[in-house]
């Protein structure tokens, strides 16, 4: 038996829930629970006693039908094909692109924003307010999609994100902008969470690796493009377009989503969906206590990580008490989820306790957490190093990160082929990604402290990019192989949330390392006032004498290398976490079923 949920390992390897079964029988009957069939879809037939489904015809042609587990065995999953699949994929990619851009695009637009709104002392909150809600709502959206449906929750997320993006662009002072950014992050969180959850529900299992590679490539591309686009916008037009361009993009994504899938996704049309939505029984399923506690715990820890060493010293009462309170709330959340999981009631726990006993889930969570550290550190700090140490512009710094930008999506595409076409066990590609990531980070940390750019630096970026590409896509590919369908959404949400949390902690660690290194070493040749000025803004380095400027930039190079050396330890930890995923016969992506006769 598998150590996951009591399912036979063979079932998980070859035929996970929802695996399509081909047949040549034809019928135009639709299940009562499914409502009407949509054109350009492939339906999942109702399971019979011999585990073979009845077949649905589609315009006198044979179609694939699927039999699998769901919360209600009478529901039939409808896979998308044709224009509906292309429209849905476009909607997911576009919305994911926009929401992910917003996590990094303000990094190069920040100076222009605070100068225009006269709020330099509140600049950090433009980033923090987005991150606290972006991180806190990931698992909440995942669980609510189980209850209220993916389409409704994603439309809600896109609407919130788009409306408050426009509000951010129209802001005339810092306080409204910070508040609107928090709501924008709430919408962006739902987009990120649901775009990964919907992939295994919209295509058959054998196509999942291909489509998750598309989503992972979009995520990585947008993460790296953010600073480049932010710099280009602020250099050639007003900073307000950093937010305004989400308006038409968000509207287009919402329209594509609205017309490509039914509200009862992935189970086809149903005239009972909105009636069920209004029922008290459905609302009783929501774990309001777990949602509130997990959200508060996430917000507090992100606040402490973002503001520690910036607005408040790390040892201050504000930061220490925030960390302690967050820890207490996380303990309370764990205790509540365990209690709720043991109850035989209607309310569904945010994080089912059975997943804690699943070593594969724990392995994926640990791997995602540790991978988040070097991933975000590389995305943010490599462009900063080019700007601060090598004196390049924001756009030029972005261009110099192209090896990282281009190789990551390439790795996800290769990974999709390896896992889905060649059926290489995802564990192997995860180990490959972790190894490349570790080698790349290690080599980058060995760069000489100099204001000149070593050509080898681009090679190190490429190696890191390949590692990140393999890692980030494989983690999501493995989730459907280690959990049942009823736990798929919450596990996906947990993996994405803990990866974002790891990245946020990684950035906080890097910031602390840089500040401490500069404070410790710069006092040897700068006054206390000069040290404070260069920590306030790296642009102030230009106010120093020529000789001191060069020495200061070399000092920053030392600090950036130290950051990567520490990130190397987390990369190694991500490889060690794979021990929890090891098994005698590593599971593979399901093979495409052969058509009968």
UniProtKB/Swiss-Prot annotation:
Q: Which residues are glycosylated?
A: 25, 72, 390
Which residue ranges traverse the bilayer?
94-114, 120-140, 147-167, 183-203, 214-234, 241-261, 286-306, 316-336, 360-380, 402-422, 424-444, 463-483, 498-518, 562-582
GO CC annotation? plasma membrane
- UniProt pathway annotation: Secondary metabolite biosynthesis
- Report the protein's function: MFS-type transporter; part of the gene cluster that mediates the biosynthesis of the gamma-pyrones fusapyrone (FPY) and deoxyfusapyrone (dFPY).
Quote the InterPro entries the UniProt record gives. Answer: MFS (IPR011701), MFS_dom (IPR020846), MFS_trans_sf (IPR036259)
Please give, as recorded in its UniProt entry, the membrane topology of this protein.
Multi-pass membrane protein
User: By what name is this protein known?
Assistant: MFS-type transporter FPY5
Native source organism of the sequence? Fusarium mangiferae (Mango malformation disease fungus)
């Amino acid at each position: 038996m598998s150590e996951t949920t009591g399912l036979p390992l063979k079932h998980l390897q070859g035929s996970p829930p929802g695996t399509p079964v081909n047949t040549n029988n034809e019928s135009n009957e639709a299940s009562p629970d499914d409502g009407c069939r949509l054109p350009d879809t492939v339906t999942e037939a109702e399971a019979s006693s011999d585990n073979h489904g009845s077949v649905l015809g589609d315009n006198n042609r044979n179609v694939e039908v699927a039999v699998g587990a769901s919360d209600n065995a009478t529901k039939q999953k409808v896979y998308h094909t044709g224009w509906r699949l292309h429209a849905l994929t476009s909607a997911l990619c576009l919305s994911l692109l926009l929401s992910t851009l917003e996590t990094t695009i303000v990094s190069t637009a920040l100076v222009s924003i605070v100068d225009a709104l006269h709020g330099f002392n509140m600049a950090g909150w433009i980033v923090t307010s987005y991150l606290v809600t972006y991180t806190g709502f990931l698992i909440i959206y995942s669980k609510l999609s189980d209850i209220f449906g993916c389409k409704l929750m994603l439309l809600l997320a896109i609407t919130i994100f788009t409306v408050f993006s426009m509000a951010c662009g129209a802001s005339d002072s810092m306080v409204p902008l910070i508040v609107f950014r928090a709501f924008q992050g709430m919408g962006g969180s739902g987009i990120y969470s649901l775009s990964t959850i919907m992939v295994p529900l919209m295509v058959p299992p054998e196509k999942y690796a291909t489509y998750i590679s598309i989503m992972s490539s979009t995520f990585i591309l947008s993460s790296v493009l953010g600073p480049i686009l932010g710099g280009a916008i602020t250099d050639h037009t007003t900073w307000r377009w950093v937010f305004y361009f989400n308006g038409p993009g968000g509207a287009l994504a919402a329209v594509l989503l609205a017309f490509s899938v039914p509200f009862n996704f992935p189970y086809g049309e149903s005239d009972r969906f909105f009636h069920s939505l209004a029922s008290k029984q459905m609302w009783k399923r929501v774990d309001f206590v777990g949602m509130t506690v997990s959200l508060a715990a996430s917000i507090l820890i992100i606040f402490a990580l973002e503001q520690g060493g910036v607005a408040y010293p790390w040892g201050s009462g504000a930061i220490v008490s925030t960390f302690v309170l967050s820890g207490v709330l996380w303990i309370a959340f764990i205790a509540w989820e365990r209690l709720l999981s043991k109850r035989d009631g209607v309310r569904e726990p945010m994080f089912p306790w059975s997943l804690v006993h699943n070593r594969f889930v724990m392995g994926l969570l640990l791997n995602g957490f540790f991978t988040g550290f070097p991933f975000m550190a590389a995305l943010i700090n490599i462009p900063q190093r080019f700007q601060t140490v090598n004196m390049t512009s924001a756009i030029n710094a972005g261009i110099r990160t192209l090896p990282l930008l281009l190789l990551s999506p390439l790795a996800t595409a290769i990974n999709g082929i390896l896992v889905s076409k060649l059926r290489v066990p995802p564990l192997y590609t995860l180990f490959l990604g972790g190894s490349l990531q570790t080698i790349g980070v290690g080599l980058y940390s060995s760069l000489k402290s100099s204001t000149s750019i070593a050509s080898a630096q681009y090679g190190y970026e490429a190696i890191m990019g390949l590692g990140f590409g393999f890692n980030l896509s494989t983690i999501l590919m493995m989730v459907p192989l280690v959990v049942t369908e009823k736990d798929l959404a919450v596990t996906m949400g947990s993996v994405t949330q803990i990866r974002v949390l790891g990245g946020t902690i990684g950035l906080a660690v890097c910031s602390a390392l840089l500040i401490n290194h500069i404070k410790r070493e710069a006092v040897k040749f700068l006054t206390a006032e000069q040290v404070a000025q260069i920590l306030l803004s790296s642009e102030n380095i230009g106010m120093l004498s020529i000789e001191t400027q060069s020495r200061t930039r070399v000092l920053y190079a030392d600090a950036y290398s130290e950051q990567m050396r520490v990130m190397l330890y987390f990369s190694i930890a991500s490889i060690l976490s794979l021990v929890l995923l090891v098994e005698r016969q590593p599971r593979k992506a399901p093979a495409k079923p052969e058509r009968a006769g």
